[in-house]
């Protein structure tokens, strides 16, 4: 069964440049996304409980977005952090795109909610 793309949006109170650092650097991602994060030659090594997963940076634009692809995933699947601004409130919005089996989207969304709460705590939100 193929996975489906789903999108989550979170309003955040910080500048896009600060948020981008937390989404695109080993030091920033290590604060909230994984226990340990290293990067070599555009490959990120994410560690949880002693095991590591590798993801390549597929595409990125400074202060706008970064897209990763797990090396074990099909080429068309990715996860992405995008930074946008609300036209009405001018508030920064974090948009997360990811793939999951249809039956797992709710659980995966809850996991992202938990991780983003940790990110917001680190950002002082």
What spans do the regions from the language model cover?
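Compositionally biased, intrinsically disordered low-complexity regions enriched in proline and serine
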Residues: 7, 21, 79-80, 115
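Hydrophobic pocket/interface hotspot
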Residues: 19-20, 29, 57, 68, ...
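Hydrophobic ligand-binding cavity/cleft-lining segments
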Residues: 1-37
